[in-house]
UniProtKB/Swiss-Prot annotation:
It comes from Oceanobacillus iheyensis (strain DSM 14371 / CIP 107618 / JCM 11309 / KCTC 3954 / HTE831). CDD domains: UMPK. It is found in: Cytoplasm. Keywords: ATP-binding, Cytoplasm, Kinase, Nucleotide-binding, Transferase. This is Uridine kinase.
Length: 210
C-alpha cells in the first residue's frame, strides 16, 4: 500500500479513439505494483429497477449514464490510500452486475473514459489530463469491431446506436472537453513521443512526493 498521495491521470477521448492503447502504453512504463487503471465504463448507473426493454434504449455516451458520484467517492478513497470495491457493468443485461472487484490503492491511478473531463469534480482530482484525438472514421471502425466481437452486438444495432447516440453525444459532450486537457494526443497509442512525455511527467511527480 502506498503512503504518499497517488498521481491521478485522466485519459479521455471519443469511443474508439485509442484511450485503452494510450493507457496500456503508460502502464508498460511502470511496474504492475505501482499503477492502477479505473475505467469509467465500470461506473454506468445501476438500471436493475428498469424493465429490460427500457435498458436497451440507454445512451451510454451521455453524461447522465454514469454514476460519477460513486466514481468520485472511490477515487477519493484511493487517494487517501483506502481500498475500494469497484462495480462491474454487464452489457448483456444492460445494468450493473452483482459482482465487485476489490482494488487496492497504488502510486499511479489512471482514470479512463469518454466523459471523465466533462465533470468538473473529476477534473479537479486529476494531476494530468489527457485527451486522445482520433478521426471519426477510425473511431467508428474500432467501435464496430469491439462491440461485435466483445459485446455480442449485431452490425445493424451498432450502426443505429452510432447514428442515434454516439455521434451526437460526441459532438455535444465529448469533443468540447478537449479544452480541459493538458495534453492532446493524436494517433492514440501510436504516438510514442506523447507517451514518453507523459511517463517523464509522472516520474517527476512521483519523485517529488506530490
Amino acid at each position: 500500500m502506498t503512503k504518499q498521495k497517488p498521481v491521478v491521470i485522466g485519459v479521455a477521448g471519443g469511443s474508439g479513439s485509442g484511450k485503452t492503447s494510450v493507457t496500456r502504453s503508460i502502464c508498460q512504463r511502470f511496474t504492475e505494483t505501482s499503477i492502477l487503471v479505473i475505467e469509467q465504463d465500470y461506473y454506468y448507473k445501476d438500471q436493475s429497477h428498469l424493465p429490460f426493454e427500457e435498458r436497451l434504449n440507454t445512451n451510454y455516451d451521455h453524461p447522465l449514464a454514469f454514476d460519477n458520484d460513486l466514481l468520485i467517492e472511490h477515487l477519493q478513497q484511493l487517494m487517501h490510500n483506502e481500498p475500494i470495491e469497484k462495480p462491474v457493468y454487464d452489457y448483456k443485461i444492460h445494468t450493473r452486475s452483482k459482482d465487485v472487484i476489490h482494488v487496492e490503492p497504488k502510486e499511479v491511478i489512471i482514470v479512463e473514459g469518454i466523459l471523465i473531463l466533462e465533470d468538473p469534480r473529476l477534473v479537479d482530482l486529476m494531476d494530468i489530463k489527457v485527451y486522445v484525438d482520433t478521426d471519426a472514421d477510425l473511431r467508428i471502425i474500432r467501435r464496430l469491431m469491439r462491440d461485435i466481437k466483445e459485446r455480442g452486438r449485431t452490425l445493424d444495432s451498432v450502426i443505429d446506436q452510432y447514428i442515434q447516440n454516439v455521434r451526437p453525444s460526441h459532438l455535444q459532450f465529448i469533443e468540447p472537453t478537449k479544452r480541459y486537457a493538458d495534453i492532446i494526443i493524436p494517433e492514440g497509442g501510436q504516438n510514442h513521443v506523447a507517451i514518453d512525455i507523459m511517463a517523464s511527467k509522472i516520474e517527476k511527480i512521483l519523485s517529488r512526493g506530490l
